[in-house]
Regions:
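Catalytic domains that recognize anionic headgroups
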Residues: 1-422
Length: 422
């Protein structure tokens, strides 16, 4: 259930659905990934009462819906890097700026796909994506919508309409969609500032109400893109993945917006997958965005490489029983603004490492709002999960950031820029 929604999720469709599954593919598959900024898991198909996303809600009826999906991190520069690299951000060569720059010594998904004849293109609506972030690495085409402005504190632009227009332009180009392709669109509008939209339902005037209007607005324009795409010759062989880079806080834990921490409202996100031969159902097992890169490349006929740190979802998308994948790891690798944070989800427990020896343990079954640290009352469980978290990170090739910037908790970013450097 979405954090803080206070409503009961709808019945699952795993035992049957009135919506027919998409027909089987008639040729090689394409993948279209849509990420929506700041979209927490309070959405109608997961039980949220407001009709904030009617188009995606209809899409969910014919999709594989994950009810407990998690982003890897709680802000864009780190979470999306995991999606396009298949690796935890702390294992990527990167600088220490908040708007992280990734070194070209990393290998991202489009580079792997290019080796196998798959074209990659992307379109975006924030200037972070146009300032040599490194996320563009390997894409054959990388575009930004016109008329946007860079503000390091927020996003003042309204761009979902422009995103859909640019998407139609790219997807209409036979150079992009004439063969196998991987397309990626990142819709920004739910990110603060929360603009009012007169055409949207009048949810109210509070920040949360305007945020819900922003989601409705993004959904409205994404719906137009999907309606346009539905009769295109490539659509029948295209897998659509819709998710978010992170969630958003509205006063929980004294927080607003996102980044800086790893609370559930910041990391529990929607995830739905719609594609040929994928019967609609709901999967309740926890899943991580670290699994998206191996899923994308396998759908495109490419074997996930051994350095990917997640596991493909393809078998369960095609009907296999979901396997156990816990613990789920969450992280904020330290930079100029973010303190170091790590977290682990296993069963009904969540452990957060706040750094400097400070850990807190939450029993999510009894306390989904993560309000009470049960570590002092359950020292054995605390010790077990601390050891498990440590063992998981001992198995990851983490690297310090480079660039010389002063880090949030002190020290300097003097890490390597690539393999073999110190």
């Amino acid at each position: 259930m979405p954090s803080g929604s206070g409503v009961t999720p709808p019945a699952t469709a795993s035992s049957g659905s009135a919506v027919a599954p998409p027909a089987a593919a008639s040729g090689p598959l394409n993948v279209l990934l849509v990420t929506i900024d700041s979209l927490r898991a309070d959405v109608p198909w997961l039980g949220y009462a407001r009709p904030i996303a009617p188009n995606l809600t209809r899409l969910a009826e014919s999709s594989v819906v994950y009810t407990r999906a998690y982003s890897v991190s709680s802000y864009t520069a780190k979470s999306l890097a995991a999606v396009v690299s298949g690796r935890y951000p702390s294992t990527l060569y990167r600088d220490a700026r908040f708007f992280t720059r990734y070194a070209d010594s990393n290998r991202f998904v489009p580079e792997l796909l290019h080796e196998h004849g798959v074209r990659s293109f992307a379109w975006h609506s924030h200037l972070y994506f146009g300032r040599n972030s490194g996320l563009e690495q390997g894409f054959d085409t990388w575009k930004l919508v016109p008329g946007i402005h860079f503000d390091p504190e927020t996003d003042n632009d309204v761009t979902s309409d422009k995103m859909t227009a640019l998407g139609i332009e790219l997807l209409s180009d036979p150079k992009q969609t004439g063969g196998r392709f991987f397309g990626w669109a990142h819709y920004m509008d739910p990110h603060d500032q929360y603009h009012a939209h007169p055409e949207a339902p009048a949810f109210g005037k509070r920040a949360r109400d305007r945020y819900d209007q922003e989601i409705w607005f993004a959904d409205h324009w994404l719906g137009k893109l999907l309606e346009w795409a539905a009769d295109k010759p490539w659509w029948a062989n295209t897998v659509l993945i819709v998710t978010a880079d992170h969630g958003e806080a509205f006063g929980e834990h004294g927080m607003y917006k996102h980044a800086f921490e790893l609370w559930d409202v910041l990391t529990h996100v929607p995830l739905l997958v719609h594609g040929p031969g994928m019967a609609p159902r709901r999967i309740e097992e926890r899943r991580s965005a670290i699994d998206l890169a191996p899923t994308i490349v396998e759908l495109l006929g490419v074997t996930p490489p051994p350095d990917f740190q997640g596991k493909s979802l393809v078998p369960e998308l095609r009907g296999a029983a979901p396997d156990a994948r816990e613990p789920i790891l969450l992280e904020l690798s330290e930079d100029t603004h973010n303190p170091p944070r790590r977290a682990l989800l296993e069963g009904h427990y969540k452990l957060i490492d706040f750094g400097r020896g400070h850990f807190e343990l939450f029993d999510l079954a009894a306390d989904p709002a993560e309000s009470t640290d049960v570590g002092p009352r359950q020292p054995a469980e605390l010790a077990r999960l601390k050891a498990l978290l440590a063992s998981k990170y001992e198995g990851l090739p983490t690297v310090a950031p480079f660039g010389g910037q002063k880090l949030h908790d002190g020290g300097r970013a003097n890490g390597p820029r690539g393999p073999g450097e110190k």
